[in-house]
């Protein structure tokens, strides 16, 4: 697990098991598996609910699924695409500045010229 998150009060493992028959049929008919969308929506709501409750959160992308499954008693065929660390931030903790592309480099409005 990420060392900076080792002091978190709790971790939530967001799991993805085998989808049901109707979900698989829908994925075949549309050519789209909505599992990632659903997990993203779930994770976003989890983070927003935590913030509303006064908790800080960090979505962790780096994880060892095999070790997590063993530690949590989760069948190995179950995917754990996301882990969220939750806890109260340390007094005076400042979020480090992120290095990200500008909105103009990542956002496109249909009908507008590409920059």
Residues of each region from the PLM?
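Glycine/small-residue-rich phosphate/adenosyl-binding loop
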Residues: 1-39
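Solvent-exposed alpha-helices and their adjacent loops that cap or buttress functional pockets
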Residues: 3-6, 74-76, 99-100
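Aromatic/hydrophobic pocket-lining residues that form π-stacking "cages" and hydrophobic walls in ligand
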Residues: 45-46
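C-terminal helix-cap and adjacent tail motif
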Residues: 82-115
């Amino acid at each position: 697990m990420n060392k900076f998150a080792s002091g978190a009060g709790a971790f939530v493992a967001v799991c993805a098991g085998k989808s049901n028959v109707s979900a698989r049929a829908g994925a075949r008919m549309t050519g789209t598996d909505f599992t990632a969308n659903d997990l993203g929506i779930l994770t976003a709501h989890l983070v927003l609910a935590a913030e509303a409750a006064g908790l800080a959160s960090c979505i962790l992308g780096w994880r060892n699924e095999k070790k997590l499954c063993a530690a949590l008693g989760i069948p190995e065929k179950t995917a754990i695409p996301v882990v969220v660390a939750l806890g109260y931030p340390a007094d005076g903790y400042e979020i480090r500045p992120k290095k990200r592309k500008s909105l103009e480099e990542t956002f496109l409005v249909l009908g507008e010229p590409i920059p």
